[in-house]
Amino acid sequence: MKTAYFDCFSGISGDMVLGALLDLGLPLDVLSGELKKIAVSGYVLSAERERRGSIAGTRVRIDIEDQPARSYREIARLIGESALESPVKEKSLAVFEKLALAEARVHQVPPGDVHFHEVGALDSILDIVGAAIGLHHLGIERLCASRVPLGGGFVETRHGLLPLPAPATVLLLEGVPVYDNGIQRELTTPTGAAILAALAESFGPVPDMVVRSTGYGVGTHPCADPPNLLRVLVGEASPGLLRRRLLLIETSIDDMNPEFYGHVMERLFDAGALDVNLVPAQMKKNRPAVILRVLLEPALQAAVTEIVFRETTSLGVRIQEVDRVELPREIGEVDTPYGRCRVKWVRTPWGERRATPEYEDCKRIALEQGVPIRRIYEEVLAAAGRGQ
């Protein structure tokens, strides 16, 4: 799986993403040609080599003439009606949706009414759609990122003096691991944060992969300590095993009606939790208790924590980052004398291919056919063995 890792040691912005993708081999004429498929005009796109400190990278410049303000609804229409390829449209719209939802929360307006003002509107369109074009052209199948530095200070805007990071940036990074590196300027822009929020699958250290190429996108600020660059590593995921950085949230409960645990588990799974465990424990004062453990993607931290506090008697949770090493898997179907059933296939590093019947399908078929679920499992495994 071709993976891009965004190393945001100096933050991230839309133009830095474009610069890094060009540095990785995206031809400028391809980028320009694809952007012309959107019905916008009044800009000149260029790129040049620049240094930040001792490191050279690609800096993108977009010179924009006076532009009208554009609403999120209008921008979505422009992208949807363009001749861009479907994967590019989907990624672009996903990023703009994240951005519009964040701006809507900041200004307390419906997302469709969010306006991107004048130059900023076109700049966002070119940065976001350009990033989607670059990822598609380079064949990136998975995007991961480092922790994100927030920056600090204040900036003068048309809305007055605003704190940094911008309010929309903070909302976009909910559920994303962030940190303060002490630099008092804008490091992560709303556009950069929206790209990560919409497209990054995980955040943390570099995933296991064989690095094939590296690109540097140069930011507008001339800062060289640390160098104002976005580094993007592109490589192939290491064969056989996949590594994901996840969160483990747990809490110990000794005073809740046990009938409620089933409901709590359903709520957590509905929210997107990857796994939920209930572990018996002995607490202080020799009270029997339950340790509730939830495995989840970092982006779901806020939602899962809220469910735990709303649905249980917990007064606090423990949160830790964990690495999950897993076998690659895919879902298929097999034919049995009782009907079709889904199967989860995994491939081990030593070449073994294993099949696991999908429980819900087996349960449904067993009830429909009036046969023991054990027999359905046996038939599914036999069919899977014949199909290997």
Curated annotation (Swiss-Prot):
Assigned keywords, A-Z: Nickel
Disulfide linkage: none
Manganese keyword on record: no
MF GO annotations: lyase activity; nickel cation binding
Matches recorded under Gene3D superfamilies: mk0293 like domain (3.10.20.300), Transcriptional regulatory protein pf0864 domain like (3.30.70.1380)
Transcription regulation among keywords: no
InterPro entries linked: Ni_insertion
Record PANTHER family: NICKEL INSERTION PROTEIN-RELATED, PYRIDINIUM-3,5-BISTHIOCARBOXYLIC ACID MONONUCLEOTIDE NICKEL INSERTION PROTEIN
Family per record: Belongs to the LarC family.
The name this protein goes by in its record: Putative nickel insertion protein
